[in-house]
From Swiss-Prot:
PROSITE patterns: GLNA_1, GLNA_ATP, GS_BETA_GRASP, GS_CATALYTIC. The lineage of its organism: Eukaryota, Viridiplantae, Streptophyta, Embryophyta, Tracheophyta. It comes from Phaseolus vulgaris. Residues 76-156 form the GS beta-grasp domain. Signal peptide: none annotated. Its EC number is 6.3.1.2. It is found in: Plastid, Chloroplast. This is Glutamine synthetase leaf isozyme, chloroplastic.
Length: 429
């Protein structure tokens, strides 16, 4: 018998040839995960994950997990996904659907025990799931699907953690629809070693070298978790998520992926689906996913969720003037945005490590130390988009995107407030 061993620090994967009917992520990719100890950075001993032999339970389970049921039945598996009681955790459960579907309206509503997720009292615990968006399931393959849902009381009222409902109202406003709001969201995240709550690739209880060599790097001494990032990238493309790129971040063990441009409510649906997929992949890899905006105190970058935003008017000739008016509105609602941009963001927005101070609104061209950054191409072309650098990595994309649309398209400041803000920000609007 051969033992499969896992360290508490460095690891790397060995890919083997998948079964012909294997789905993208449940194939031998993860079952052949090979863990290697980094003796230079950790004295931790190997721990036994499993004992494997030719006729092992692992091999038999793998065969069942990789079954392609499509030739044998029209039925599919739908994984219903919703946001839990913390507002950042994702929950899910599966059900059988009689045939493949093309639209969430073809799916039945469902329910769950809200008392077990912190979303309902025990004496009235039923919460109803409304299917809102569907994606291909990269774990099961075939016609199986992931279903993004929002949650309601039995009376049809959105529960407090259902932020999608309010966002859908904003994005269905005719004034917002006419402006076709685009969003490009940069989701940063940190990978942690299981059981020690310490970044992947870091010596347990210690620190790597200072920041500098890690951003967009390659090499076993600089890049930690690339296989997870790449597996997530491909799984999102398979699912139909509008993922547009990925890169290693400034802090070692931290990564980023980008979703968009997406229109309106779609941006939130795609981010939540991508987060769920990332949680599942890190689960299979034995690594913990953290969306904490400042996972490590000290001279280390935090984790944000920069949100790029434009409207039809911003993208057309003369759009830079529209962008400046939007910046003015955002400055006047700075407190409202900060309060909705993620838990613990005050630990990240310090004015250091490519952030602006949480207490002061600022904007600039190509300045990553500002609240709102405008790219040089936008300034040069006189049209384009703005980047809101304030949202934390654990922000709710439904809240952030709808608030941007509301503040720039639906909310009107008083003339006096507008004039004072324009003078303060040196904006001629």
């Amino acid at each position: 018998m051969a033992q499969i061993l896992a360290p508490s620090t460095q690891w790397q994967m060995r890919f083997t040839k998948s079964s012909r009917h294997a789905s993208p992520i449940t194939s031998n990719t993860w079952s052949s995960l090979l863990m290697k100890q980094n003796k230079k950075t950790s004295s931790a001993k190997f721990r036994v994950l499993a004992v494997k032999s030719d006729g092992s339970t692992i091999n038999r389970l793998e065969g069942l997990l990789n079954l392609d049921i499509t030739p044998f039945t029209d039925k599919i598996i739908a994984e219903y996904i919703w946001i839990g009681g913390t507002g950042i955790d994702v929950r899910s459960k599966s059900r059988t659907i009689s045939k493949p579907v093309e639209h969430p309206s073809e799916l039945p509503k469902w329910n769950y025990d809200g008392s077990s997720t912190g979303q309902a009292p025990g004496e009235d615990s039923e919460v109803i799931l409304y299917p809102q968006a569907i994606f291909k399931d990269p774990f099961r393959g075939g016609n199986n699907i992931l279903v993004i849902c929002d949650a309601y009381t039995p009376a049809g009222e959105p529960i407090p953690t259902n932020k999608r409902h309010r966002a859908a109202e904003v994005f269905s406003n005719p004034r917002v629809i006419a402006e076709v709001p685009w969003f490009g969201i940069e989701q940063e995240y940190t990978l942690l070693q299981t059981n020690v709550n310490w970044p992947l690739g870091w010596p347990v209880g210690g620190y790597p070298g200072p920041q500098g060599p890690y951003y967009c790097s390659a090499g076993a001494d600089k890049s930690f978790g690339r296989d997870i990032s790449d597996a997530h990238y491909k799984a999102c493309l398979f699912a139909g998520i509008n993922i547009s790129g990925t890169n290693g971040e400034v802090m070692p063990g931290q990564w980023e992926y980008q979703v968009g441009p997406s229109v309106g409510i779609e941006a939130g649906d795609h981010i939540w689906a991508s987060r769920y997929i990332l949680e599942r992949i890190t689960e299979q890899a034995g690594v913990v996913l953290s969306l904490d905006p400042k996972p490590i105190e000290g001279d280390w970058n935090g984790a944000g969720c920069h949100t790029n935003y434009s409207t039809k008017s911003m993208r057309e000739d003369g759009g830079f003037e529209v962008i400046k008016k939007a910046i003015l509105n955002l400055s006047l609602r700075h407190k409202e945005h900060i309060s909705a941009y993620g838990e613990g963001n005050e630990r990240r927005l310090t004015g250091k490590h490519e952030t602006a101070s949480i207490n002061t609104f600022s904007w600039g061209v190509a300045n990553r130390g500002c609240s709102i950054r405008v790219g040089r191409d936008t300034e040069k072309n006189g049209k384009g988009y703005l980047e809101d650098r304030r949202p934390a990595s654990n922000m709710d994309p439904y809240v952030v995107t709808s608030l941007l649309a509301e503040s720039t398209l639906l909310w009107e400041p008083t003339l006096e407030a507008e004039a004072l803000a324009a003078q303060k920000l040196a904006l001629k609007v």
